[in-house]
């Protein structure tokens, strides 16, 4: 299971993380880790990671990339399938803590590594959400899965909604965790000029944080150490899924901000307001119009809405309106005192709610 520390953001990263998703593996800046003990954890983690990867890792050639993913459950199960799309700065391991519990109720779980995440590489061109959805459909076709429950967190929620727009017959139901049910820029357009400028400034990171999470490391162990949470004495093998070699060095999240076009306040502003310099991929999340997409909704949709006084994207009212308008299909559940990441803040409640939803969805073999 992914340790809780993998979602515990330090204060200086708070606004940035919540703005573009969830920094799924952050660690404390304050504590110095005993290097000898940590080396033992690292060696053990490497063995665990390799074993886990061998058991659950799959890769399929699709139109644009070799699409990589983790899988749990019976690989012959083509009827009861949940496919999960992770949030920003995350990867397929995001859903690992819940997979086996859902296998127990008869589901096959597939968690995708999106472009430039985990073990899925970037396509050789400026690929959009549409291109990624085509690759995911290709994966489903290869696996002979005619339709599945599609779920996603934050950015992954928007990708899930986009997939439904493009390939509605492939979707038996949707789970949208704090993303994908309301247009991304909705909360920004509610702000006056001063408030908007202040919110955009929160994207800019201090230099020490920038170096720690988006810099280079001399070797894999140093990169592992940078994300290790000393308050949790486990091996934390999932950290290894975030480490990549680059130019004879090692990185963790380097390059991700630029890929989302959310490197700083200027890039964030360009993305929100549709600057033509923004890539097709980065602009994809802004262009999704959930209210329009769900006008003719005819499948069950579960909206999980994180709300708090510090909510970076307050859209409770919009979610409520959407659910009331399509009450036969859309269920809206709010989780209070959560800024964004429900599955971390309330893992048991999250599992309970989605389990109930999955048990209620009517799946066919057609």
Language model features with spans:
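Active-site loop/oxyanion-hole signature of alpha/beta-hydrolase fold enzymes
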Residues: 111-151
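An N-terminal hydrophobic leader/cap segment in hydrolases
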Residues: 30-59
């Amino acid at each position: 299971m992914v340790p809780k520390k993998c979602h515990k953001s330090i204060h200086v990263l708070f606004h940035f993380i919540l703005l573009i998703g969830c920094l799924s593996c952050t660690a404390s800046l304050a504590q110095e880790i005993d290097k000898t003990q940590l080396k033992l954890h690292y060696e053990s983690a490497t063995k665990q990671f390799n074993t886990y990867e061998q058991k659950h890792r799959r890769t399929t050639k699709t139109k644009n990339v070799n699409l990589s993913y983790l899988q749990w459950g019976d690989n012959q199960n083509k009827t009861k399938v949940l496919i999960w799309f992770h949030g920003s700065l995350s990867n397929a391991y995001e859903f690992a803590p819940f997979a086996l519990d859902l296998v127990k109720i008869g589901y096959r779980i597939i968690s995708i590594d999106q472009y430039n995440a985990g073990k899925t590489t970037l396509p050789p061109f400026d690929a959009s959400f549409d291109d990624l959805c085509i690759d995911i459909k290709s994966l489903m076709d290869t696996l002979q899965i005619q339709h599945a429950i599609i779920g996603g967190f934050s950015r992954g929620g928007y990708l899930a909604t986009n997939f439904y727009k493009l390939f509605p017959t492939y979707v038996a139901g949707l789970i949208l965790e704090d993303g994908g049910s309301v247009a991304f820029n909705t909360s920004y357009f509610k702000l006056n000029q001063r408030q908007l400028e202040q919110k955009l400034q929160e994207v800019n990171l201090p230099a020490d944080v920038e170096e720690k999470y988006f810099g280079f490391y001399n070797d894999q162990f140093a990169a592992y150490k940078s994300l290790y949470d000393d308050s949790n004495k486990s091996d934390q093998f999932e950290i290894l899924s975030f480490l990549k070699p680059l130019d004879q060095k090692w990185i963790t999240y380097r390059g991700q901000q630029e890929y989302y076009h959310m490197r700083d306040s200027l890039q964030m502003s360009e993305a929100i307001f549709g600057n033509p310099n923004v890539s097709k991929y980065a602009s994809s999340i802004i262009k999704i119009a959930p209210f329009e997409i769900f006008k003719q909704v005819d499948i069950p949709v579960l909206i999980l809405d994180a709300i708090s006084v510090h909510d970076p994207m307050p859209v409770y009212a919009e979610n409520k309106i959407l659910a009331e308008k399509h009450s036969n299909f859309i269920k809206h559940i709010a989780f209070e005192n959560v800024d964004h990441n429900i599955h971390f803040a309330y893992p048991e409640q999250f599992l309970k709610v989605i389990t109930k939803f999955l048990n209620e969805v009517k799946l066919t073999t057609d």
